[in-house]
Amino acid sequence: MYKTIYVPVDNSDHSNMAVELGVRFAKIFGSKIVGSHVYAAKMHDKRFKQMEAGLPEEYHDEKELDRQRQIHDSLITRGLQIITDSYLDFVDQKCAEANIPLERRSLEGRNWKALAEDITKNGYDLTIMGALGVGAVKDSVIGSNTERVIRRVRNSDMFIVKDTKPMNGGKIVVAVDGSHYSFGGLKTALALGKAFNKPVEAISAFDPYFHYAAFH
């Protein structure tokens, strides 16, 4: 059902649970996991250039500025790559423990944009990502990066992790409205229910006053 499972990570609690669930899905469906992290070295380079005007006078020489830019760029890029590797090492460890094949991907750019482009380009069967990340704001239900990715991806099933507790018990609920998308969701839910031994419940909502208001 899912040959490739894409898991973006940022070392947050929701991200770590996404990794745990990704491994669980991969064991059931015989999938390969693709772990990714996005870092923004170019953004740091841009911010450094914006701050150059505030540097001491001795650094305003163009040659010295160029030297400082190269040093800054090298340090930032290397530092962000080390952080990225440490995040992906966690995915590597979990996959190795479960004997799951893993592909590591380090991406550069704006988080949501790089993720949406990577998913769209490679067409991963399933994407599992946390609803919130390290930049979570108190009382947030879903983070801006996750929301933007969901709104832009059309070729991958999306599993958004909202609870950092293990997925035990409970049931799968499907909202149906007669569209082919909702019936596709129902078919997916039935397959997942069978795979995870969970009951499936289909629900539909209607507004008894809609037609009266619309046609009178």
What residue spans do the PLM features occupy?
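Gly/Ser-rich helix-loop-strand patches that form or flank binding pockets
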Residues: 14-15, 21, 27-28, 104, ...
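Charge-dense, low-complexity intrinsically disordered segments
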Residues: 9, 71-74, 78-82, 136, ...
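Structural beta-alpha unit
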Residues: 14, 40-46, 50-52, 65, ...
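Glycine-centered small-residue hotspots that permit tight backbone geometry or close packing
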Residues: 11, 35, 91, 109, ...
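Short secondary-structure transition/capping segments
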Residues: 79-87, 118, 151-156, 204-216
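Conserved active-site and cofactor/substrate-binding residues in soluble primary-metabolism enzymes
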Residues: 82, 86, 144, 184
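Small/aliphatic-rich secondary-structure junction motif
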Residues: 1-70, 98-100, 171-216
